[in-house]
Amino acid sequence: MILGLDIGRQYIKAVVLDKTKGGHKLVNHGLRLVPEPNQTFDPEKISQPHWVMAVRELMKEMKINPKRVKHLVTSLNGSHVSVKQITTMDMPQEELHSSMTFEARKHIPMDGSEAVIDYQIFGSNPKEVDKIDVALVACTKKTSSAHIELLKEIGFKPGIIDVDPIAIMNSYSYANDLP
């Protein structure tokens, strides 16, 4: 069982997928209005008990015990998350990893906060030889930690944490059997 959980501005959304021979099958889904509609979900500023209760109620409606979820996929969004597509030299994985920290500081404003940085390679750049296109992602460590703490408070074991644009791309790639 894979649980996808999206804590959005107006709704908390969840889907449950089971792996089948042909891919995945949607077996359950749920939707719940957030505790204070139209309030932006900001992991750094939320009243955690409100959100914990709302997600737990949704899980109860869906008959899901958070402690039994083996594969949880969530995403971060909001003003403390930055995503930027950049073009960089094609290089070995180890060098690319080191290079991304430098590139993040150059391309993504993080107001001096300690950042959590990740990236995803889109592929070769069609216009420039020996260059690749990369999605560079950064958020504050405080945002990441607050999201993880929220998930733990609900009873989940945090799994994959994406940012919304990358989550959409990964879902599309996975559904269409793309690399």
Residue ranges, per PLM feature:
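Conserved NTP-handling cores and scaffolds of large molecular machines
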Residues: 19-21, 59-62, 66, 108-112, ...
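Phosphate/pyrophosphate-binding loops at sites that engage ATP/ADP/AMP, CoA/4′-phosphopantetheine
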Residues: 55-70, 154
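Active-site neighborhood for divalent-cation/phosphate handling
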Residues: 71, 75-174
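N-terminal phosphate-binding loop and adjacent alpha-helix
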Residues: 29-62
